[in-house]
Every structure is written in structure tokens, then in C-alpha cells.
UniProtKB/Swiss-Prot annotation:
Function description: Participates in a DNA-damage check-point that is active prior to asymmetric division when DNA is damaged. DisA forms globular foci that rapidly scan along the chromosomes during sporulation, searching for lesions. When a lesion is present, DisA pauses at the lesion site. This triggers a cellular response that culminates in a temporary block in sporulation initiation.
Reported cofactor(s): Mg(2+)
One Pfam family this sequence matches: DAC
Enzyme Commission code: 2.7.7.85
Family the entry assigns: Belongs to the DisA family.
Protein name from the UniProt record: DNA integrity scanning protein DisA
PANTHER family per the UniProt record, alphabetical: DIADENYLATE CYCLASE, DNA INTEGRITY SCANNING PROTEIN DISA
Transmembrane segments: none
Provenance organism: Halalkalibacterium halodurans (strain ATCC BAA-125 / DSM 18197 / FERM 7344 / JCM 9153 / C-125)
Top-level taxon of the source organism: Bacteria
The gene coding this protein: disA
One annotated GO molecular function: DNA binding
Length: 357
């Protein structure tokens, strides 16, 4: 399962059967009763051709109803979002020519129905105590909550370590910006770290989707660790992209499609930023526009930040400018000019104190 398909599967499918949902409660009841079961979500044209027998219900879904109906041998068909029970005790006759790697009759039928219809099919094993999801050509066995929680907590610890390193790299980059010593190597290094941190965040979100109501604490820890990271990276892209009118969200989306190995090559990051001419990243100086640092000044609207960036070439030009020069920028009065001047000095002082020497 590639990362994009896996993310979509976790977001759309695993959420439906996550702990805390009515559907998962019903499935767990069937699992504990050891009756086994076959549940299909969706009754489209493809389904009509393979359903045989059973009886039509069209009643609201409830865990208790699912539990009782699973005592019968046939499959249960729900509507697409699992809020209604449409049919019960039906026999499913998918095309036998469709390949299946499963051995048990129930699981083999489930896999073929999923491949033939594209619907979500849930197979509850009678003997093995396993819940298996089939969706199109995808197969996924639901794991024990304890196992997922352990993996999620390990991922949070890993994220915490990577985020600490990233925070220090961003601080060091800020200090170098004020010293006008930034090269594209430092920019690439920060982008690589951001990519790794966002990948770990994506993994944790997949766990959260599968954990459902059991994942609240994991979600809180995740938000605490990476709440402003996307904003930080978008501003970083605006600072260092070749063209000022680049769409930073598009650059970020392209970056997240790259593998860690691809981004270890600095030239790939430079291409994402719009630089196609090869140069020595260790020596080539990079001048930030100032979006990221200016956004750290409280009560400074985005329009004012844009006006400042267009009026001055970089942060240091703003820092060196006197109050009169700042006042001349559109939308900046005397009070705001003083706010900007004091804010930049304070940020510079803090960065120099926190940098890794």
C-alpha cells in the first residue's frame, strides 16, 4: 500500500470502524460471540447481481441488531455510511474467476465481493478472532487496540526527538539570517527535517484514525508537538523560493510526495523551490525575504508583512531602517514602526541566546 493510498484508506475507511463508532461496537459484539460474520457496506448495481436470497429490512443500524442478525449464516448488507441495515441473511455469489489468496470460504467471498464491487467488506473470523477489511484490492486486518496504542506512543516519542532537533535547526537558521550568513545548505537541512517530522505526523494520524475514541490523548500530544509546523514551513518556502508569487502549499504538497532519500539530495529541494540551475549549496548565499521572522511579531497583519517584504530586500535592511523609513511603508504608522523595530531587535536577541554554537 503506497503512502497516499494508505492515508486515504486510514482517513476514509478505518475511521468508520474505529473504536467508539456504533459499527465497531457491533463488530466487537459479533467477534466476542464467536459467530463470525460478513458485512458489506453499500448496495450498488454491482452488488445487485451477486446478492441471492435473504430478506429486506431497511431499518436503522444498531450494534444490538447487527449482533442478532450475525447469528444467521448469511451476509449482512448496510448502506454506504453504515447507518442502515438493508438486507440480512443473504448469500453472496461473486465471480469465481476473480483471484483470491484467502483460504477460508468467508474471507475468500469477502475478497472477491470487494474486488468486484469496490465496496467495503468486513469479514469477522469465527475461530481466529480477527476482523479483516477488504476494499477494492486492499486488504487490512484490524489490530488489537493495545498494539496500536504502543506503536502510537513510540511514534510520539520519535516525533518529540525529531521535533527538538528541528526546532534547534530553525533557531540556528534564524540567527544566521540576522547575520546574513545563510547558505542553501542550511535551508535544505531544515526542509529535510520538516519532511521527516511531517511524515511521522502522518503515521501517527493513521494510528489515531484506527484508534477512534481511544486516540484522544495521542491527538492532544500530537497537536502540542506540531501545531504550528505547517505554517512555519509555508513561510519558510515563501522566504526562500526563487519567485515571490510561488504557491507555498503547492511546493509543500510536492515535497511530501518525495521520499526521504530523494530529499537527501539538496538539488531536489532547490528544484522544488524553483532553482533549476546547479550551484554549490555549501557556498551559495541564500537571502530570506523575511516572511517567517516578521510573522513572529505580535499584532502584525499579513498585509503589512507583505508591504514590508516588498519595500525592503531582507530582514537586516528592516532592522537597519530608522522609524521614518519604516513609517513610509504603506499601512505603517509611527506606533507600528516602533513595534516592528522593537520586535525585530527582541527576536534577534532571543535567537542569538538560543542558537547552538
Amino acid at each position: 500500500m503506497d503512502s497516499e493510498v494508505k492515508e486515504r484508506f486510514a482517513r476514509n475507511i478505518l475511521k468508520m470502524v474505529a473504536p467508539g463508532t456504533a459499527l465497531r461496537t457491533g463488530i466487537d459484539n459479533v467477534l466476542r460471540a464467536k459467530t463470525g460474520g460478513l458485512i458489506v457496506l453499500g448496495y450498488n448495481e454491482n452488488m445487485k447481481g451477486i446478492v441471492d436470497g435473504g430478506f429486506y429490512l431497511d431499518c436503522p443500524f444498531s450494534p444490538a441488531s447487527l449482533y442478532e442478525l450475525a447469528k444467521m449464516d448469511g451476509a449482512i448488507i448496510l448502506n454506504e455510511d453504515g447507518t442502515k441495515i438493508l438486507y440480512a441473511n443473504t448469500q453472496l455469489n461473486p465471480d469465481n474467476a476473480i483471484s483470491s489468496n484467502e483460504t477460508g470460504i468467508r474471507h475468500r467471498t469477502a475478497e472477491r465481493v470487494a474486488k468486484q464491487t469496490g465496496n467495503l467488506v468486513i469479514s469477522i473470523s469465527q475461530r481466529r478472532n480477527v476482523i479483516t477489511l477488504y476494499h477494492g484490492h486492499l486488504r487490512y486486518a484490524l489490530r488489537d487496540i493495545g498494539v496500536i496504542l504502543t506503536k502510537a506512543n513510540q511514534a510520539i516519542q520519535t516525533l518529540d526527538k525529531y521535533k527538538s532537533v528541528l526546532d534547534q535547526d530553525i533557531t540556528d537558521l534564524g540567527a544566521l539570517e540576522f547575520e546574513e550568513l545563510v547558505t542553501f545548505h542550511e535551508v535544505s537541512q531544515v526542509m529535510q527535517r520538516i519532511h521527516m517530522v511531517l511524515n511521522i505526523k502522518g503515521e501517527i494520524l493513521n494510528y489515531v484514525n484506527e484508534l477512534g475514541s481511544e486516540g484522544r490523548l495521542i491527538t492532544m500530544q500530537l497537536n502540542e508537538l506540531v501545531s504550528n509546523l505547517e505554517k512555519e514551513v509555508l513561510l519558510l518556502i515563501q522566504d526562500y523560493a526563487k519567485e515571490d508569487d510561488v504557491d507555498p502549499e503547492d511546493v509543500l504538497e510536492q515535497m511530501m510526495k518525495c521520499s526521504n532519500e530523494e530529499l537527501l539530495d539538496d538539488s531536489n529541494i532547490l528544484k522544488l523551490l524553483g532553482y533549476h540551475k546547479a550551484f554549490n549549496v555549501q557556498e551559495q548565499q541564500a537571502t530570506p525575504r523575511g516572511y517567517r521572522i516578521l510573522h513572529k511579531i505580535p499584532r502584525l497583519p499579513a498585509t503589512i508583512v507583505r508591504n514590508l517584504v516588498h519595500s525592503f530586500e531582507n530582514i537586516n535592511d528592516m532592522l537597519r531602517a530608522d522609524l521614518k523609513e519604516l513609517d513610509e511603508v504603506e499601512g505603517i504608522g509611527e506606533a507600528r514602526a516602533k513595534l516592528i523595530k522593537d520586535g525585530l531587535s527582541r527576536i534577534q536577541e532571543q535567537l542569538f541566546m538560543d542558537r547552538n554554537i
